Amino acid sequence: MKVQGRDCTLTLLKDNEYYPLPYSEETVRQASKGYALPGCIGRRNREKLVETGKSITGCVVTRLEYNNILALFLLLFYSDDKFDILVDRVCTKLIYKNVSVKEFELRGENNEPLYFRLDVKDNDDSYVTSWDITTPSLPWTECRTFYYDGHSVIADSKTLPLVYRFELTGKFTEKTKYQITLYFPLSTEHYPTQNKIEKLTITLDQRLGIWLDLYDLKPLDDMTDVNCADTVLCFQKFEICGCVVFNIRNQSQNTQVVL
């Protein structure tokens, strides 16, 4: 993304390692926190907010690439660990210190790039500071971008004819919760899936051997057959009661991250 003819940069810093990301979108900011005072009864006064401090909130959206995919999934694995976000918006250069993962979304549409959204939250020692002379400006280096193939989704050893979109979400609160939504053309031959899916496999990149395995998927809603001659597009949401496994397996790397 360019602002005033210059590229913005977005970099994650964790354990003294820098991970430049392709700048797609980010809303990381400081938000006011406090309490509200109600207006006086009988008068048309607006509710007033008494500010007691600032909190860091927002999200980062980036494309999935070979240079960042493992680092992003390791952030989910160590969801309680803290990291920094370095943002160069041309007019301002800020560092959001000691934030952690609040939730995430991985989404893909058929023949389109895979996108990863990371929502952040602040901690007791979180703060915002400006770049100093020692802060490195690391431009993103273009590499292989991963594209989603809607014909490569496997449910219980059976390849589904088409899942044209999916959304995998996770929330890290007192109890970690994962859900996935599958979008597909309605077909009595392959759908609806009323029973739970024991294992769902989503290929992220066939060439480099990168995929996701999701275990013990329980449908959260029922499907209804529609007597229609035309194609009917629908979706079904599942709760992931088992684990989410991220895999990289090729000649140079054999890595597995279990969430």
Model-derived features: where do they sit?
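Signature of extracytoplasmic/envelope-associated structural regions
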Residues: 1-259
